[in-house]
Amino acid sequence: MNLERVSNEEKLNLCRKYYLGGFAFLPFLWLVNIFWFFKEAFFAPAYTEQSQIKGYVWRSAVGFLFWVIVLTTWITIFQIYRPRWGALGDYLSFTIPLGTP
């Protein structure tokens, strides 16, 4: 999609939809929102809706960073402690590795 062909009001509407969609446990939408609208929010000539778009881009970045931290922490903890959790660790695993922990 070429954002240059879309009206400023439509840009704001699209940015808002991606921002709200990220709350449905879809942090990838926040990443898309950041990439699509970063230049529009911070480098384009000023217009009425730009301050709202800037807010959505910042909040999308914070939400995406939060999810990256949470998922990285969980993956690290799970990889380190899964063998110690015994049956629970096996229950949470999709595949059970062979060998001894």
Swiss-Prot record:
Q: Does the keyword Cell membrane apply?
A: yes
The record's subcellular location field reads: Endoplasmic reticulum membrane; Golgi apparatus, Golgi stack membrane; Cell membrane; Membrane
Which residues lie toward the Lumenal compartment? 79-101
Q: Tell me one GO molecular function of this protein.
A: endopeptidase activator activity
Which regions face the Cytoplasmic side of the membrane? 1-17, 37-57
Q: What Pfam families does the annotation carry?
A: PEN-2
Renumbered to this chain, the signal peptide range is none
Q: Where are the transmembrane segments?
A: 58-78
Print the keywords alphabetically.
Answer: Cell membrane, Endoplasmic reticulum, Golgi apparatus, Membrane, Notch signaling pathway, Transmembrane, Transmembrane helix
Give a short account of what the protein does: Essential subunit of the gamma-secretase complex, an endoprotease complex that catalyzes the intramembrane cleavage of integral membrane proteins such as Notch receptors and APP (amyloid-beta precursor protein). The gamma-secretase complex plays a role in Notch and Wnt signaling cascades and regulation of downstream processes via its role in processing key regulatory proteins, and by regulating cytosolic CTNNB1 levels. PSENEN modulates both endoproteolysis of presenilin and gamma-secretase activity.
Q: What is this protein called?
A: Gamma-secretase subunit PEN-2
Provide the species name: Rattus norvegicus (Rat)
Lineage, highest ranks first: Eukaryota, Metazoa, Chordata, Craniata, Vertebrata
